[in-house]
């Protein structure tokens, strides 16, 4: 072990006076020869100390006294249960007890006080909290704890209970939690429950709680501009489901409720064929008037400026966030079919339906809100088959026409409504072939080939051009870049990257093309650079935290994510995100599977039961 600073020499006290042999010292006119005198350092005037242990130790001792019923000066009688305590502790923790014991109330002079309208178990938990600063809120006690905390004015416990209930929100219970919050004047919880209900209305309307709503609460919900629905038809259907749950008692409220359905925003077909033909609607004069009003709005567009009102105002549904899909790839020595979805708002990866085939080196892109997986290698053979994923149904279909060539390590992108497959290899040679898919015709057709054969190529669309970036010509990695102009069916070279890269990740972000990772002649890369189409130049950005070949790169909700890959020794399941403001990458979670050569695609979060809006997050049911 190394010496401490100053070791090897003898240090003297700062205020020591040393007199050596042959020296002179004068004190009070005398002298001393050959002696050493050491003066004591002056004592400090103050020494301040604050104990961090004291509050906890004191509370612990006070609680022990309470447990042993020592020095207790009050007994709380709650539901027949006697709880011993100290007035000073209760008064310090609770405004309710402080007012009781320090004022002129009769209880201030009593040694036993009866507390009514409170659950005895909840009271015991709250008294324990006063002495220990600890409480466990759970599903079995929150409905008694919250009203008890409200009564005793224990604001901290009220907040904890509300936070717990906020985390429990789902479409089957949000209306009950909303009513509970309203009853106990928990305004923040009420606001969040309202917002959750509005944003997840399509799922809430199918719950039993919705069918049991009092008419006033139903009106409060459906009159909101923030109701998140695809069309006003859903609101009408929800109202009629509620009505028909108990027609005998509720038909009297139909007009009151229907006036908050925005009938003028319905399609003419639905208004006439469904609303206008409903027997309950037709039998109520006020309802018929509402239908006629909507018909006039639809039939007389020139009069609409004079007919504006709450029923003609479009709702403002929530803008759904984007989610990232990681598709296929190579893991643990084999191609995989698994697919998972990343939600940046929760930072969670969730498995979704797998593809029908294992695919590594797969090309992935999103066209018309559907996710396409193109080609790849299944571990035994090269593929030309295509699969298409619908996030609304969580299902893959294989009814897409195959590409004209088998392709793995292929680049895939969407330009002008067409899906392009660029380069790759077919098991015999590296390809420069390019073809595009027309979803209306379910047909692939060839376009002009690239000037260079490229496998492990990255592709990007910017400014109406399709860029093919890097890759390998079958012999060595490339730094060359070319772009395709669909108007002239022609490829033209642009400035090369500063680094040769194959199996790189590529994405368009803030009007730049970002190229990250990949592999050069020698090793996997962590470096990254970006292309400015205005100046036709590449410039470096900060390197990723890991080397990544076979990496996926995508922009999700305005952030750039690098997903998976291979670092030279291990397949990766980590992801990292780039911040252009700080020019830094940071790790932000892991996939369920390690993936090399998987594809990535970005879509709007679907409106299904698997996506539940909650304050600043999406919540999985029963998770």
From Swiss-Prot:
Kelch repeats lie at residues 323-369, 371-417, 418-464, 466-511, 513-558, 559-605. One of its GO terms (molecular function) is ubiquitin-like ligase-substrate adaptor activity. Gene3D superfamilies: 1.25.40.420, Kelch-type beta propeller (2.120.10.80), Potassium Channel Kv1.1, Chain A (3.30.710.10). Residues 20-32 have a biased composition (Gly residues). One of its GO terms (cellular component) is Cul3-RING ubiquitin ligase complex. It comes from the Eukaryota. InterPro entries: BACK (IPR011705), BTB-kelch_protein (IPR017096), BTB/POZ_dom (IPR000210), Gal_Oxase/kelch_b-propeller (IPR011043), Kelch-typ_b-propeller (IPR015915), Kelch_1 (IPR006652), SKP1/BTB/POZ_sf (IPR011333). CDD domains: BACK_KLHL20, BTB_POZ_KLHL20_KLEIP. Pathway: Protein modification; protein ubiquitination. One of its GO terms (biological process) is protein ubiquitination. Residues 174-276 form the BACK domain. Keywords: Actin-binding, Kelch repeat, Phosphoprotein, Repeat, Ubl conjugation pathway. It holds the Pfam family BACK. The modification Phosphothreonine is found at residue 19. Transmembrane segments: none annotated. Residues 72-139 form the BTB domain. This is Kelch-like protein diablo. It comes from Drosophila erecta (Fruit fly).
